[in-house]
Curated annotation (Swiss-Prot):
Its EC number is 2.1.1.-. It comes from the Bacteria. The keyword Methyltransferase applies. The keyword Calcium does not apply. This is Putative S-adenosyl-L-methionine-dependent methyltransferase MRA_0733. Pfam families: LCM (PF04072). Keywords: Methyltransferase, S-adenosyl-L-methionine, Transferase. Belongs to the UPF0677 family. GO terms for molecular function: methyltransferase activity.
Length: 301
């Protein structure tokens, strides 16, 4: 839900607890023998937050299916979804840096440890934007276990409801250099104005973000039945990316979509004979319009 203008939170409450939940999912996925991702910093960060629920969850003392009133398949789908999303964006950064990008911006970085765990090329600068207490918590916790950034890490202390583009420029962002931007799982928490705050970025910059899907719980469960690879292919169709000259996060990025015909027959075959409802295809084509002061463009993803 959109955040109020004056709400407060930390990593144990409100939207901050969501960051801890995602980190717990990465910790569980790291232990998964399928080995899709390896985030050795997720578990110590979750433990440091100290929420009993998530600590017990990563210790295997809590059955998320029972606790959350979910079927075992859907509970696992939630964890698999976090793993696949993490891998997808990890690969995005690797592709960007393989193409010569040496400047990265992570919006609402939370407990994201990519600045510490990805093999960044020499000279890569990773900007992490978040509230001071969140950044300081992560920095202190990881320093306490001897972790060191694998890139030049620059932290930007600011709430995304404030003038973060100006703060980013003040922190040293080179507006003439191609930049890889990431908005992972955070657009839905912002009111419209911060989502439309523009920042100048160089040609050949890229942005990727995860957007909300209708009936996400069922979509996750269905999509994971064929395994990680099929899920990854389908997830790729729900993320969006574009290349542009002047950049602005679209105001409708978290909500707009183009639906396709219901696929009740397909879903019934996948869910079993007890499923009788019609469902809008959870992976429709999606057109995102990139607006700027000088030009407009759109991309179907």
């Amino acid at each position: 839900m959109p955040r109020a203008h004056d709400d407060n939170w930390d990593l144990a409450s409100s939207v901050g607890a969501t960051a801890t939940m995602v980190a717990a999912g990465r910790a569980l996925a790291t232990k998964d023998p399928r080995g899709l991702i390896n985030d050795p910093f997720a578990e110590p960060l979750v433990r440091a937050v100290g929420l009993d629920f998530f600590t017990k969850l990563i210790d295997g003392e809590l059955d998320i299916a029972t606790t959350g009133n979910l079927s075992p398949g859907r509970a696992q789908a939630m964890i698999d979804g976090i793993a696949v999303r993490t891998k997808y964006f990890d690969d995005y950064f690797r592709t960007a840096t393989d193409g010569g990008v040496r400047q990265v911006v992570i919006l609402a970085a939370g407990l994201d440890a990519r600045a510490y765990r990805l093999p960044w090329p020499a000279g890569t600068v990773v900007y992490e934007i978040d509230q001071p207490q969140v950044i300081d918590f992560k920095t202190t916790t990881l320093a306490g276990i001897g972790a060191k950034p694998t890139a030049i890490r620059r932290t930007v202390y600011i709430d995304l409801r404030a003038d973060w583009p100006a703060a980013l420029q003040a922190a040293g962002l080179d507006s003439t250099a191609p930049t890889a931007w990431l908005a992972e799982g955070m657009l839905i928490y912002l009111p419209p104005d911060p989502r439309t705050g523009c920042s100048t970025t160089a040609p050949n910059s890229v942005l990727r973000a995860a957007r909300s899907l209708p009936n996400l719980s069922r979509a996750l469960w269905i999509s994971t039945q064929a395994g990680y690879e099929k899920w990854r292919i389908r997830f790729a169709s729900t993320a969006w990316t574009s290349t542009w000259r002047r950049w602005c996060i679209p105001a409708n990025a978290a909500t707009s979509s183009t639906t396709c015909a219901p696929r009740a027959g397909t879903l019934r075959a996948q869910c079993g004979p007890t499923y009788s409802g019609a469902m809008v295809c959870p992976f429709p084509p999606h057109t995102t319009t990139i607006r700027s002061a000088k030009s407009s463009s759109s991309a179907v993803v």
